[in-house]
């Protein structure tokens, strides 16, 4: 199958039954292969949603400069989406972000700015807001942007419901910005209020 643009390949990822799970449970456990998205993660969905919806509302236009604080997959996805849609983008991250992620972002044409490890993501977000106040770019603000969970309410959630035939009892998701778990759970709970939602994060996580 051929697609005219890369954004049309985002989403509709496959569900795969996990066969080798610990314990003796007979429950069916499915994993959704979000790594099959073109930039390699579930973050492709909100990245496109935030840019496309802001553009549709007339808040930004191709050629504008976008700014975002991110040290992970959202940055890679935003760099891809910005390149495809004709935006410049500056990504701000702590200096201890992985070299592999930095390389992926720059490969898509993003400009990177580092803050110190001690400043962390809070410092990166502060700098992004300062740049916006100085007219140096438009902050997408993945942490507070409703277009983040909207991507999962309109896409990921309906896909899961469709591909399970509605036969889902639990949804389990990691939590970062919480866009995935908020959007998917909102949709699934509308279909069946009895579905259980389980959020996971590292014991020492800051989310």
Question: What spans do the regions from the language model cover?
Answer:
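PLP-dependent amino-acid enzyme catalytic core
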Residues: 1-207
